[in-house]
Swiss-Prot record:
Keywords carried by this UniProt record: Early protein
Protein purpose: Plays a role in virus cell tropism, and may be required for efficient virus replication in macrophages.
Family membership noted in the UniProt record: Belongs to the asfivirus MGF 360 family.
Induction of its expression: Expressed in the early phase of the viral replicative cycle.
Upper taxonomic lineage: Viruses, Varidnaviria, Bamfordvirae, Nucleocytoviricota, Pokkesviricetes
UniProt keyword Oxidoreductase, yes or no: no
Protein name in UniProt: Protein MGF 360-16R
Organism: African swine fever virus (isolate Tick/South Africa/Pretoriuskop Pr4/1996) (ASFV)
Single GO biological process annotation from the record: taxis
InterPro entries per the UniProt record, alphabetical: ASFV_MGF360
Amino acid sequence: MLSLQTIAKMAVATNTYSKCHYPILKVFGLWWKNNTLNGPIKICNHCNNIMVGEYPMCYNHGMSLDIALIRAVKERNMSLVQLFTEWGGNIDYGALCANTPSMQRLCESLGAKPPKGRMYMDTLIHFSDTLNDNDLIRGYEIFDDNSVLDCVNLIRLKIMLTLKARISLMEQLDQIALKQLLQRYWYAMAVQHNLTIAIHYFDNHIPNIKPFSLRCALYFNDPFKIHDACRTVNMDPNEMMNIACQQDLNFQSIYYCYLLGADINQAMLMSLKYGHLSNMWFCIDLGADAFKEAGVLAGKKNRRVLQYILGLNIFKRELIPPCKDPDPYQIQILLKNYILKNVSTVFTYYCQ
């Protein structure tokens, strides 16, 4: 049951006050001051999220009680930890990121289960498996700069995260710090499952994420996010095409890179190298004609039937009308239900 003082603080925090009331709010414990915040604590009447100062911290509706509690624990702000716990924040999340013995004891005194053994890894996996915005954000906040992960097998953790994210999070296992790896992991999971609130949150809270956001957009075939990322990220079109070809059926990503000037013959060969034949046929529809090189590569990969087909002089090229500019709306309309035309040509040839 909530205490009378807790209920009173909640009632006060749901209202907006003028600056002349700020000294009273500070005395009342409804003030948050740190390196980035300095303002009154408010509760949104509609979603029960926490806001600080004149404007929300994140997106349109502030931050959840759990996120506020996690941040207060990391800042070792004991009064706010107690306040947010009394208001309904999950103190177990706080215990997972408590960075001092005194803060750990406070969390346990407020009802947290002492974290032990695999609980940290199990929680990390749970947050990424539930596939909703709030859990991805909670996972990011709990494990960002969390020293407990210094004790885990880093190579095993990096491999596991890369497999779950589906997209390569790093070039080599030793080339990226764990903090950056985890940031990329949460972002990739959000993009992969189109969790727009989490994407917006990470865009605003993870520094220098834009280059990786472009890689995600290319890999997961999202022309709108590609278009947005290209406004701030300068990447060579052929490098972009290489990323796009790493996932099959990435027609919209490949077409966007093609319009930027990427080499479509190289895209055809890269698609075959990765074993993504739908991408290869799409490149042929766009005008790729590296049939001799592709035939040699198919032979090396022991694809004898494909090698023979690529040697036939039956293919039509430039079957897709080019857009004047890489407009994601036009690209999506043009390719959403695209049928590979030269695959039909092959079937027609053999059915004659």
